[in-house]
Amino acid sequence: MSAASLRLVDTPMDKQKALDAALGQIERAFGKGSIMKLGAREAMAETEAISTGSLGLDIALGIGGLPRGRIVEIYGPESSGKTTLALHAIAEAQKAGGTCAFVDAEHALDPAYARKLGVDVDELLISQPDAGEQALEIADTLVRSGAIDVLVVDSVAALVPRAELEGEMGDSHVGLHARLMSQALRKLTGSISKSRCLVIFINQIRLKIGVMFGNPETTTGGNALKFYASIRLDIRRIGAIKDRDNVVGNQTRVKVVKNKMAPPFRVVEFDIMYGEGVSKVGELLDLGIQAGVVEKSGAWFSYDGQRIGQGRENAKTFLRNNAAVAEAIEAKVRANAGLVASAMMGAPESDGDAASPD
């Protein structure tokens, strides 16, 4: 073929015809919508978010909450608030008319506590599977139905492979749990994206043996979930909240360790009160100070020139009893979300795990 004919084929019109033919062939083979321009559909261009129940965490995540159609991992030590955070997300989704499911592999969900957090337990679907394979098959079926808005798996550590359940105590099953998670996530990822379902995996922490330098902590289930998760949240209890001698809640810190939707490494702190969940009025005080909306002078908190309480607990009580003031502070905090988010930036953590999901 001559050089002239090659140049003739290389015109923009010929390229467009070749591209149209290729796109038509792909759509005939795999169905309409199997390939498109990124901005062709509004649903593809913008990611919907489901609130976490924490105003500060919604701001830290950059998109107003947890993204639909993505995988989220929440991990931390025992009794740090992992399940509480997941139940708050379920409650927020239900308020918006969504349908939610909870795969309780730990067999430890308390309906009374879930109800106190605002979860409609009469409408919440719950499964308590016997084996890890069963739990993940149930999750896959629910996601593929396209009818579920939020699915929580509690927890990855409790997804015991059937071979381990049927074996003897002390039998070695090296890598079985990691292979189960890797296979399940490969299967789930596509259907999660198509169904616009938010899938939250709750995970536990383990210590790596023989680590002399760096962070010795790791999560269960291998490396696959670290790769497939769009957002990873590290939640820790950093202190106790006391009423005289009684502990009535925990001070909690959440770090956005990974975020594919916005800048990561933001850190937010809030109170988790026993029987109540995330303290919204406590958050309003903290975020209000960061946004310059609430003033703190000594032990006194003031808003708009008016003193609202001496001491944090008294100020929280004032906001709890004066909903109009609380709403006004929240509106101003949301208006100054960029300023608040910039104050949340933390340092990245080094993670020595760099293996492929297989």
From Swiss-Prot:
Among HAMAP family, the record links this protein to: RecA
Q: Does the keyword Metal-binding apply?
A: no
Question: Does the keyword section mention Oxidoreductase?
Answer: no
Q: What name has this protein been given in UniProt?
A: Protein RecA
A single cellular component GO annotation: cytosol
- Compartments (UniProt record): Cytoplasm
Q: What does this protein do?
A: Can catalyze the hydrolysis of ATP in the presence of single-stranded DNA, the ATP-dependent uptake of single-stranded DNA by duplex DNA, and the ATP-dependent hybridization of homologous single-stranded DNAs. It interacts with LexA causing its activation and leading to its autocatalytic cleavage.
Q: What is its main location?
A: cytoplasm
PROSITE patterns per the UniProt record, alphabetical: RECA_1, RECA_2, RECA_3
Q: Which keywords does this chain's UniProt record carry?
A: ATP-binding, Cytoplasm, DNA damage, DNA recombination, DNA repair, DNA-binding, Nucleotide-binding, SOS response
List positions binding ATP.
Answer: 76-83
**GO terms for biological process, alphabetical:** DNA recombination; DNA repair; SOS response
NCBIfam families to which the protein is assigned, alphabetical: tigrfam_recA
Q: What family does this chain come from, according to its entry?
A: Belongs to the RecA family.
